Amino acid sequence: MHEYSVVSSLIALCEEHAKKNQAHKIERVVVGIGERSAMDKSLFVSAFETFREESLVCKDAILDIVDEKVELECKDCSHVFKPNALDYGVCEKCHSKNVIITQGNEMRLLSLEMLAE
């Protein structure tokens, strides 16, 4: 249930951005959640609804989640691609097994809609 600690940090980050931008209210929070992030979206939403109640700035914020697909990069030929299956072990161009995940294994804050004072 690491979703609760992640959302707690997300709310704190939102409050920081609001303060920095002299906003008194955040209306919308848009996050990208990678398909390999090990994040349970229903728990994430539940945690957000719980934690936003404790924040004056985020109390009425709407949460939008963007699903982010995995993106891979081959370290041998530099080819960047999105795999068609869950087989992340082979480059589709040169067939090397030297590939890394470059996107889709994290949760990112993509944007905030705020009301300035």
Curated annotation (Swiss-Prot):
InterPro entries assigned: Hydgase_Ni_incorp_HypA/HybF_CS, HypA/HybF
Function: Involved in the maturation of [NiFe] hydrogenases. Required for nickel insertion into the metal center of the hydrogenase. Is also required for urease maturation.
One Pfam family named in its UniProt record: HypA
Keyword set includes Metal-binding: yes
Family note: Belongs to the HypA/HybF family.
Protein's UniProt name: Hydrogenase/urease maturation factor HypA
UniProt lineage: Bacteria, Pseudomonadati, Campylobacterota, Epsilonproteobacteria, Campylobacterales
Subunit structure of this chain's protein: Monomer and homodimer. Forms a complex with HypB.
Impact after mutating H95A: Does not affect nickel-binding ability
UniProt organism field: Helicobacter pylori (strain ATCC 700392 / 26695)
